[in-house]
Amino acid sequence: MLKFIFKRLLEALPTLFILITFSFFLMRLAPGSPFTSERAYPPEVMANIEAKYHLNEPLYKQYFLYLENLSKGDFGPSFKYKDQSVNDLIASAFPVSIKLGMVAFAFAVVLGVTAGTLAALNQNSRWDYILMSFSMLGVIMPSFVFAPVLVLIFAIYLGWLPAGGWNGGTAMYMILPVASLTIAYVAGIARIMRGSMIEVLHSNFIRTAKAKGLSMSRIILKHALRPALLPVITYLGPAFVGIITGSMVIESVFGLPGMGLLFVNGALNRDYSLVLSLTILVGTLTILFNAIVDILYAIIDPKIRY
């Protein structure tokens, strides 16, 4: 098992290197400059600014310099936020995004697995139709559409919840962003779990367990749940990617001081260092989580270890 884990993590390194390389050159080759504005700088001032940030160097030298700094954990200075490094900006924004993403992910898994299991146990019943109808609604409605609807109902009309802000990540301020992020993935997980659980419940070993007189709760928890989770675990990798990238949109909608707001401001102001660093960070989390999903799959189903 340790050999499989080491191999899977090792395979992620080339992907990370390609991500860093492509992101760097795409950002540098984009038209415009971080210092392009309506106010034109004198040529001497522009030359000094570019020399300060090594933008006057050939592109390949900038690339190797960036790799050297990156190997030391230095993301470089921000071009927009004066006298602040990208490391400091990410350090203040990352806890907001990761807390929002992890809470949304946990709720999506728990609610999705529970709803899918209940629908499978009550196949073709009223509860099954209700749960699957709600899941279909969650699939077809993207989070950036669902979020304003929630704000309109619960913040403006009813006044139960704040329409935006963070306030240290208290529960009241997280309910609407988490709900906006979670709904689509609860729906996706529920539909996958329902189909998988129905298939498992019609297996021969489940019939044997029923013939032995085991209770349905014991059959589900001890025999059916583990094999039924395999397709769900496969879906968790893309779901995590969707939640992390979706949180950037949701943060902009609710005005949360996370990586999403930084990314939008950085992109609008051509802040190369900031946008590149956030892209690499999100990409690294994505690659790492996909590797973790593969490892979890191997733990549950040892047949895939190779």
Curated annotation (Swiss-Prot):
SUPFAM superfamilies: MetI-like. It is found in: Cell inner membrane. GO terms for biological process: protein transport. The chain crosses the membrane at residues 9-29, 100-120, 136-156, 170-190, 230-250, 280-300. Residues 30-99, 157-169, 251-279 are periplasmic. Gene3D superfamilies: MetI-like. The complex is composed of two ATP-binding proteins (OppD and OppF), two transmembrane proteins (OppB and OppC) and a solute-binding protein (OppA). This is Oligopeptide transport system permease protein OppB. It comes from Haemophilus influenzae (strain ATCC 51907 / DSM 11121 / KW20 / Rd). The lineage of its organism: Bacteria, Pseudomonadati, Pseudomonadota, Gammaproteobacteria, Pasteurellales.
